[in-house]
Amino acid sequence: VQAVRTGYCTIIVQEQPTARTIALFGINKIREKGERMQKLNFGCGKRFAPGWVNIDFHSVDPLVKRVNLLEGFPFADRSFDVVYSSHVLEHFTPQQAKFLLQEAYRVLKPQGIIRIVVPDLEDLCREYLRVLAQPDSDPEKADRYRWIVIELLDQLVRSETYGEMGKFYLELNQAQTQTKNLDQDQKLKNLRKYVQDRIGEIPNTDPVSLFWSDRFNAFLPKKMGTTLSYAYLRLIAALLPPSLREMVLIQTTIGERHRWMYDTYSLGKLLEQVGFSTVEVTDHQHSNIPQFNDD
């Protein structure tokens, strides 16, 4: 979604080259072409770029500033021309998401643009119903049905790293490696293309290997702080009664679990409540932010 502070904003649901996206963006240019803009990327994770102010709960690179987003953005009012956030809001409660958008509005200059990317609840529901309505005789229905249910629900209920989505990736990768049947191979290729058209990519790495790789990389010097923080949380969790342990562990998977879902209507209304206007839908290829796709 792109939006403007008392101007317009942009909402994008699933910013992938091959996936349907929802974007809301403003119509007016916020800066003359060639003039340097101040740009903020909050909740950036591992996706950040020079020329932007990148902030997140944990820093994975010197270009990323460590900030507790739920305590507010450490910037003065009207500091930025552009605010961007991709796949962040869905990991927070609606109340927390509203606070983050209020902070974004506060730090944006008049006529500044916000561009928000979240999973598209409407598209997921429509695709689920479309697959469900396919005849049972369709040989590809079962696999597609399994995937769309995982895509819709897994990150809402996930209680372990990678969840059912990781298991699906592993099974698909292994099946394609092992099959010698041409018909089965084509069926698996069709399934892979279907999933890629939905999410944009499928990890080729065995989720189990990726799990251990993550833990090895976590001990690199720049990640030691984050590693120790998570180790501390899990140690505390281990000392809690079983009834509370799962709740605490779930709280440590904020980067994986979804706390809410949005569509064009709900996210547009939320942006308007905060103060944004001129909300529109766009895709990953279009933006009124000058040179946005060059970053």
What annotation goes with each model-predicted range?
Residues 91-92:
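A short His-aromatic
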Residues 70-82:
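A short acidic, Gly/Pro-enriched loop at the edge of an enzyme's catalytic core
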Residues 38-72:
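Class I SAM-dependent methyltransferase SAM/SAH-binding core
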Residues 98-110:
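A short glycine-rich, Lys/Arg-flanked "PGG" loop and its adjoining helix->strand segment in the class I
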Residues 96-99, 113-295:
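S-adenosyl-L-methionine-dependent methyltransferase catalytic module, highlighting the catalytic core
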Residues 82-88, 97:
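A short beta-strand submotif of the Rossmann-like class I SAM-dependent methyltransferase core
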Residues 15-36:
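Short, Lys/Arg-enriched N-terminal segments with co-localized hydrophobic residues
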